[in-house]
Amino acid sequence: MAVSIVVDSGRTHEDYDMQSPFTTFPPGTIRQLRPSDLPRFRDHLLRLDSESRRDRFNGMADDNYVASYAERCFAQGTTVIGYVEGDKVLGAAELHERPELPEPTGEIAFSVERKLQHMGIGRRLFERLIGNARGLGYTKLRVTTHPHNEAMKALARRFDAMLSFEEGETVGVIDLDPPVAGRRGFFMSPAERMFT
């Protein structure tokens, strides 16, 4: 089920003054991507500017690698949540299973196109991804990034990630508590929030 975040029908993110404090969320929808969304997801990753692409892939990644990566995500059953505006995916959160680890663990990754960064889209994608991870029975989430990706480290800390430095990368681990009936906060679904 898509979580609608349309603020003002007919407006796009370009209609907002990006320099002023953002008081409303950009129009669009955060939803799980379908198999037919593969081309939109791939195009989103290919549109990332060089810095955003380096942050997302922890280093340099050429177009061929990025296109192949997007196809692997969908072929291997990765959960991909997207911020979709019109017919474009402009942000994405990925949940990759790590079956080799002893506890049910997911590796997570995020990307938001430059023009929409620092508007709360990453946080909303993170919230939705945590809900999906809980629903799939994961007890831990891991995120890795290069040590200079301050935005990702701040986002991970916001969700109580324990950060450490391993083999040249910053690694964050989030312990997921099981869902608790009536829990308030950003891990509740919109439907749950309506009845609390």
Tell what function each PLM region has.
Residues G168-T196:
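C-terminal "cap" of GNAT-fold acetyltransferases
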Residues G28-R40:
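A short beta-loop-alpha structural element at the N-terminal edge
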Residues R47, D55-P104, E113:
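Acetyl-CoA-dependent GNAT
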Residues V143-K153:
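Conserved beta-strand-loop-alpha-helix junction that forms the acyl-donor binding cleft
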Residues T144, R157-D177:
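Conserved catalytic-core motifs of GNAT/GCN5-like acyltransferases
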